[in-house]
């Protein structure tokens, strides 16, 4: 059964659904959807989460990731299942169940806002800050370089998918390899960090909100917010790619 499941899932990553030359392979689709997960939200988002909500908020990010897997599957499944062969995604699903285009229009408007805010400004701002502090590159020069690269990717057909196909595996190797390296070479500190995360998730020191119960809720909310920012589960942003 395991081999059969692997054949129907993992082994289909490099196959195309269509024989057309401009169609996307399963791996390109997978890489494009994964590009939003292995990115700024998983690096800067976690650090910001700890800064605001404390170490305990990381635990609630784990909870968000666990339930987010099922949520991401449901939204992608429903978005593809409710497509009419031409349009697919959360907008088409909302239009079908709501029997009005208003919900689809609202989703599109909010998606544009989210793409400009959490989808572009945070990434570009974080990268520009790192380039400025690490290499002394002015922010406006870095922004100009990013603009040129974004233009080159945007004008080409399937350019984004082709770029993600090459970059995402490298990003994933560095991200997962770096994380495992920290755990392997610093096992005692990693164990202490995990213990601190679990402890502060349920028994934090009262600080910002003035009470232990309030701090737990604050830590939980911050962890769930940053978890959604990191994995985008429930936002419907990856459905159109699938």
Where are these regions (language model features)?
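N-terminal alpha-helical transmembrane segments of multi-pass membrane transport
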Residues: 1-36, 51-56, 68
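Juxtamembrane inter-helical linkers in multi-pass membrane proteins
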Residues: 7-18, 84-97, 197-202, 239-241
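Membrane-interfacial loop-to-helix junctions in multi-pass transporters
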Residues: 17-25, 55-56, 98-104, 135-142, ...
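Alpha-helical membrane segments and immediately flanking helix-loop junctions
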Residues: 20-51, 86-91, 109-112, 212-242
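Helix-loop-helix module between adjacent transmembrane segments
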Residues: 34, 64-84, 91, 95-125, ...
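Hydrophobic alpha-helical membrane segments of integral membrane proteins
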Residues: 56-63, 161-164
């Amino acid at each position: 059964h395991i081999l059969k499941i692997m054949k129907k899932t993992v082994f289909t990553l490099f196959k195309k659904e269509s024989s057309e030359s401009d169609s996307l392979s399963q791996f390109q689709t997978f890489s494009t959807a994964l590009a939003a997960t292995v990115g700024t939200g998983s690096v800067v988002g976690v650090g910001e989460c700890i800064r605001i909500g404390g170490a305990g908020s990381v635990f609630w990010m784990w909870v968000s990731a666990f339930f987010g897997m099922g949520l991401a599957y449901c939204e992608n499944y429903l978005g593809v299942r409710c497509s009419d062969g031409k349009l697919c995604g959360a907008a088409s699903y909302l239009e079908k169940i709501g029997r009005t285009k208003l919900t689809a229009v609202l989703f599109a408007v909010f998606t544009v806002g989210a793409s400009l805010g959490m989808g572009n400004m945070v990434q570009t701002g974080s990268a520009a800050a790192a380039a400025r502090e690490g290499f002394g590159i002015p922010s406006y020069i870095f922004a100009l370089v990013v603009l040129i690269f974004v233009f080159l990717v945007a004008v080409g057909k399937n350019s984004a998918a082709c770029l993600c196909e090459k970059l995402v595996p490298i990003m994933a190797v560095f991200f997962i390899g770096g994380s495992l390296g920290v755990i392997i070479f610093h096992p005692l500190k990693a164990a202490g960090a995990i213990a601190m995360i679990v402890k502060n998730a349920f028994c934090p020191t009262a600080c910002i909100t003035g009470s232990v119960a309030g701090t737990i809720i604050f830590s939980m909310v911050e962890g769930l917010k940053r978890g959604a920012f990191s994995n985008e589960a429930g936002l419907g942003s990856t459905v159109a790619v699938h």
